[in-house]
Swiss-Prot record:
UniProt-recorded name of the protein: DNA-directed RNA polymerase subunit Rpo10
Cofactor details (free text): Binds 1 zinc ion.
Major localization listed first in the record, in broad terms: cytoplasm
Superkingdom, taxonomy of origin: Archaea
EC code: 2.7.7.6
Subunit structure: Part of the RNA polymerase complex.
Family: Belongs to the archaeal Rpo10/eukaryotic RPB10 RNA polymerase subunit family.
SUPFAM superfamilies: RNA polymerase subunit RPB10
GO molecular function, one term: DNA binding
Pfam families reported in the protein's UniProt record: RNA_pol_N
Record gene name: rpo10
Reaction catalysis annotation: RNA(n) + a ribonucleoside 5'-triphosphate = RNA(n+1) + diphosphate
Organism: Methanocella arvoryzae (strain DSM 22066 / NBRC 105507 / MRE50)
Length: 71
């Protein structure tokens, strides 16, 4: 579960999460052998300019899927 707002500045970031995730997956599928995935332009296109908000999206890990079997 992505946080609704950036922990540092309070900007709403959850509204771009699904689009960000979809674009990253699409870009991964189109990578050539040896290429490195660069997501900076995806974040720029989505309007995520502050480095604190970019950090929130780049470092997020979906733990719900990992922890779900232990309910």
């Amino acid at each position: 579960m992505i946080p609704v707002r950036c922990f540092t500045c309070g900007k709403v970031i959850s509204e771009v999460w699904e689009e960000y995730k979809a674009r990253v997956e699409e870009r991964k599928m189109n990578l050539q052998h040896g290429e490195v995935l660069k997501v900076g332009d995806i974040l720029d296109d989505l309007g995520v300019e502050r480095y604190c908000c970019r950090r929130m999206l780049l470092s997020h890990v979906e733990l719900v899927d990992v922890l779900a079997p232990y309910q």
